UniProtKB/Swiss-Prot annotation:
<keyword id="KW-0456">Lyase</keyword>
<dbReference type="InterPro" id="IPR004155">
    <property type="entry name" value="PBS_lyase_HEAT"/>
</dbReference>
<dbReference type="Pfam" id="PF13646">
    <property type="entry name" value="HEAT_2"/>
</dbReference>
<keyword id="KW-0042">Antenna complex</keyword>
<dbReference type="GO" id="GO:0016491">
    <property type="term" value="F:oxidoreductase activity"/>
</dbReference>
<comment type="subunit">
    <text>CpcE and CpcF associate to form a lyase.</text>
</comment>
<dbReference type="GO" id="GO:0016829">
    <property type="term" value="F:lyase activity"/>
</dbReference>
<keyword id="KW-0605">Phycobilisome</keyword>
<comment type="function">
    <text>Required for the chromophorylation of the cpcA gene product.</text>
</comment>
<dbReference type="InterPro" id="IPR016024">
    <property type="entry name" value="ARM-type_fold"/>
</dbReference>
<dbReference type="GO" id="GO:0030089">
    <property type="term" value="C:phycobilisome"/>
</dbReference>
<dbReference type="InterPro" id="IPR011989">
    <property type="entry name" value="ARM-like"/>
</dbReference>
<comment type="similarity">
    <text>Belongs to the CpcE/RpcE/PecE family.</text>
</comment>
<protein>
    <recommendedName>
        <fullName>Phycobilisome maturation protein</fullName>
    </recommendedName>
</protein>
């Protein structure tokens, strides 16, 4: 069955046909689909890429490991989609990549995806000592992105990620709230101010 579904993706001869074929393959939820779903991320078909990302997220850790082993260093579009999948999976093994991409990647779409992912890590998969150290790194990177990234969409993502990081990183909640408060009053973009203010308000209310 999976062989036929994979063949259908490879044989698709239209954008709509590719989306349908990828959707069918994703719905099968089989690890055999992972290489093909990853390859779709490099196609110039955003609709198919969205479906492939969703399929990879459903497959979890095996998909994350495959993405990490096959990351496209040259196609920034494929890299951004791959990081969106990693963000959705929350795989702790992806943390080094997410941290470096959030800080250093030239592509704003990659930085935004990586920043978003730093707030969605499966912290329960790490030991307490590793968890505390990695959460500190995430906070410092997100703070850097929130304050200094030149693209407002990345700063917006950083504010959202700090909000989702805070409940798991109780030792950092005061620092996170202070960082959000500062940005709510200083960012040049009103959308970032508003998102920072919303995150701070939700944290204060325990939402």
């Amino acid at each position: 069955m999976s062989t036929e579904l994979i063949a259908a993706v490879e044989a698709a001869d239209s954008a709509e046909g590719l989306v349908r074929a990828v959707a069918a393959l994703s719905a099968a939820r089989t690890d055999a689909a992972i290489p093909t779903l990853i390859s779709v991320l490099a196609f110039n078909n955003p609709g198919a890429a969205v479906v492939a990302v969703d399929g990879l997220i459903q497959l979890g850790s095996p998909a994350a490991q495959a993405i990490l082993n096959n990351l496209d260093d040259y196609n920034y579009g494929a890299r951004a989609w791959a990081l969106r999948a990693l963000a959705g999976i929350g795989e702790p093994a992806a943390l080094p990549l997410l941290l470096s991409a959030a800080r250093e990647d030239f592509s704003l779409s990659v930085r935004r995806a990586a920043t978003y992912g730093l707030g969605r890590v499966r912290w329960a998969d790490l030991s307490e000592s590793d968890r505390l150290a990695q959460q500190q790194q995430c906070y410092e990177t997100l703070k850097l992105c929130l304050q200094y990234d030149p693209e407002w969409v990345v700063r917006y993502a950083a504010a959202a990620a700090l909000e989702t990081l805070a409940p798991a990183a109780t030792q950092l909640q005061s620092a996170i709230a202070e960082t959000l408060n500062r940005q709510a009053h200083s960012d040049e973009e009103r959308a970032v101010q508003a998102r920072s203010r919303l995150a701070e308000r939700r944290l204060a209310a325990g939402v």
